[in-house]
Each structure stands twice: as structure tokens, then as C-alpha cells.
Amino acid sequence: MTASPLAQKATDAFNAPICETDPEIAELLDSELGRQRNGLEMIASENFVPRAVLQCQGSVLTNKYAEGYPGHRYYGGCEYVDQIETIARERAKALFGAEYVNVQPHSGAQANAAVYQALVKPGDTVLGLALDHGGHLTHGMKINFSGRFYHAEAYGVNPVTFRIDPEIIRQRALETHPAMIIGGWSAYPRIEDFKAMKEIADEVGAKFWVDMAHFAGLVAAGLHPSPVPYADVVSSTSHKTFGGPRSGFILAKQEYAKKLNSSVFPGQQGGPLMHVIAGKAVSFKVAGTPEFKDRMQRTLDGAKILAERLLADDVKANGISVLTGGTDVHLVMVDLRNSEMDGQQGEDLLAACGITINRNTVPFDPRPASVASGLRIGTSALATRGFGPKEYEEVADIIGTALAAGPSADVTALKARVDKLAEDFPLYPDLDQIH
């Protein structure tokens, strides 16, 4: 049989590459590839996925609907996606030493929403790190679901050390009687004491949940304490330090399995994104390799090198300091409260040099969040490109020199140094542009 001319035309269009189907979007995809290749990505929540993950996310798995869980789907034709999801779950269990894993959450925020639904009831009190002290919007921000559907209370950092202090958490827990205490953060440069937080939760009869989205890669590499032995539930994204696809997953004790499964599906989501779950499976495998541990070590080393440069006298002279005086993780928090430069200006200055970061509030910030008094600078993506101590020293000096000089910085000269680093460490060199 022969297709009609119109049907044949439709078939030809179906099989056409994007440069023919939609040149406008194709051009923008090429532009974004160029932006990532030619600059230095230092947003702490960003990273680059392996080529294998890109292949998963652009695969035929994007066509497959698979509501339910392996062996218990509401659709036929799931024999292969069942295997993929099972592999992802088992790899994550082994990697993190967890009794239960759910790899279906579309994002970290959706994973967190499922945790709330499983562990507490609407109106219950929850206690998390204040957003302007380094917490995440899903930890109780008033206009987020977590602050609208639950009675959200907050603990802050110690006003002298700017560190999370278990005694402050304990006092707030005794005052507020939370049903759940939340650990984890979005913009905090130190390691939390999960054991102490668990003891506080037990003292007040609260569940203990840790959102390890930012430091999951460090935990997987054995370079950061794991919250899994202490928390009732642990949630995470699969990108950030972990370097996988933009998505989420949940780890927990087996006793919460049924509630969490129901909270994810059908409580929060319908069909899972199987092309993304395949990418997560690949990422869990990668995270168990010596090469991954080396990358995480270089990530930590780079952050310490950056912090040390930003503590130098020329930077201090511009009223700039490093929050907590250093870092234990993949990011550095720059404090601009005493500088004439605000966070927006600092972000724009480094962007002009070819370095992408983000402005961020700091504790006791006198400026509005739209401009903020802080910069959050991460080192994960540079480690993925292959940076070592020498390269981190160079990029740290570029950032330090720019911030010390402020508006009088020689942006052209600094940009040339960034260009050289980007050229020396090519990103996706075998990935062809679409055009």
C-alpha cells in the first residue's frame, strides 16, 4: 500500500530534523550550547550531564506512558521501562545505603511535596531553615505550597558565626512543637549535624526529613556525611553536585514506602518521565565510580581555593567578606552587606567577564531579595569540565580581581582569561551544532 500524498508529506515532516521543522528553536539551541561552552558556569545548583544522559533524555522513552510502578502499571507495553526503573531504584539503594527509593519525582520540589503529603497533615507545624538564611522555598516560604498548606516556622543561623546551631534549632522546636523538622539547605556553605537534629526531632516527637539536593553528589562520593542513617526521609534532586538530569528522587526507611509511593503517584503526579528516569539510572551508575569521587574532590578543593582568594585583603578592602569564613561544600557565599556593590551588580559584573553565578540573600540582609547582598558561587560544573587546582586558582583570581575592583574592573582583560579557560576545557566537543 502507498500513503496518500498528504500522509507522505506528514511522514516526511515527522522525520525531519529540527533545523528544518523549527529553525528558530534550532538556532536558540545552538546559541545555548555556545553559551555553555564559551563561558564558565558557576551557579551552585547547575552542572553538566554526561553525554549518555543527554542520549537518554532525547530517546524514544519520551513516548512511553507508564502510570504506576514496575509490575503494577496501568498501561501495557511497560516491559522495558519496568526494567529501567527497577535498575534506577536498585542502583540508588546501593549508592546511598537506603531501604527504599522512589525515582519518579519530576523535580526536587515535587519530591518535597510528596514528603509533606506522606509525613504530615495540612495545618501541621513544620520547622525549617529560613529562606533568607539559606533555606529553600519548599521548606516553608509563605507563598510556596509548603507555607500555604502547612504552618511553617523557621530557625535561623547563629547571628555571630552565621552557622546552623543545633541549640537554636532545639529552642525553636521546643517553642513551636513541630510535627516535622527539616534539614538541608539551598545556600549554606557548611556541614549540618544530622545526628543532633535527629535527637532534637526525637525529643519533641517530630519526623526528621533532610533535603540533600545540593550535596547529594558529595554524599554519594563519601565526602560529606550522609543523612540517610538519621533521617526518616531524604529527598534530593539528581542534578546540582550529582550531575544527572534535572529531576528528583526520595530515599527513606522501608516503613514509609507505602505512604511515599502513594504520595508520588497518584498523590502528586501521573505518569513518570521514563526518559528522565533512564538518565537517573545512568547517573546513579556514574556516581559509583572512582572518576566521580575524584570529580567531587576537585569540586570541594575548588570551592576552598575560591574562598581563600575571596578572603584576600584586596577583596576585603571593597567591603566584601566570605560568609562563615570559608566552606565545607561545593559553594561559597559572598557577603556584600558592607560593600557599595549589591548582589545584582556583582552578578552582572561577573557575567560581563564570562562567569555565570547568581545573587542571593544572606542572613540579616538589609537589601531586598531582588538585588540582595550576597553572591552564591559554585564549583561543580567546572569540575565536570575537568578543572583542577591550577584552573581553580585562575578562576578564583579572576573573580577576586573583579570583585575587588568593582565597576572599575578591566572586564576585557578578565574576559580574555575566562575565554582561555573555556577553550582549554571544551564542553561536549563531539556534540555537533544543529545547524
UniProtKB/Swiss-Prot annotation:
PROSITE patterns linked to this entry: SHMT
UniProt keywords, alphabetically: Amino-acid biosynthesis, Cytoplasm, One-carbon metabolism, Pyridoxal phosphate, Transferase
InterPro entries referenced in this protein's UniProt entry, alphabetically: PyrdxlP-dep_Trfase (IPR015424), PyrdxlP-dep_Trfase_major (IPR015421), PyrdxlP-dep_Trfase_small (IPR015422), Ser_HO-MeTrfase (IPR001085), Ser_HO-MeTrfase-like (IPR049943), Ser_HO-MeTrfase_PLP_BS (IPR019798), SHMT-like_dom (IPR039429)
Listed EC numbers: 2.1.2.1
Pfam families with a match to the protein in the record: SHMT
Transferase keyword on record: yes
Compartments, as annotated in UniProt: Cytoplasm
Catalytic activity: (6R)-5,10-methylene-5,6,7,8-tetrahydrofolate + glycine + H2O = (6S)-5,6,7,8-tetrahydrofolate + L-serine
Annotated metabolic or biological route of this protein: One-carbon metabolism; tetrahydrofolate interconversion; Amino-acid biosynthesis; glycine biosynthesis; glycine from L-serine: step 1/1
Chain sites annotated for binding (6S)-5,6,7,8-tetrahydrofolate: 131, 135-137
Gene Ontology molecular function: glycine hydroxymethyltransferase activity; pyridoxal phosphate binding
Keyword Amino-acid biosynthesis: yes
Residues with PTM N6-(pyridoxal phosphate)lysine: 240
A GO CC term attached to the entry: cytosol
Protein origin, superkingdom: Bacteria
Family assignment from sequence similarity: Belongs to the SHMT family.
Quaternary context: Homodimer.
Its job: Catalyzes the reversible interconversion of serine and glycine with tetrahydrofolate (THF) serving as the one-carbon carrier. This reaction serves as the major source of one-carbon groups required for the biosynthesis of purines, thymidylate, methionine, and other important biomolecules. Also exhibits THF-independent aldolase activity toward beta-hydroxyamino acids, producing glycine and aldehydes, via a retro-aldol mechanism.
Designated name of the protein: Serine hydroxymethyltransferase
Organism: Bifidobacterium longum subsp. infantis (strain ATCC 15697 / DSM 20088 / JCM 1222 / NCTC 11817 / S12)
Gene name as annotated: glyA
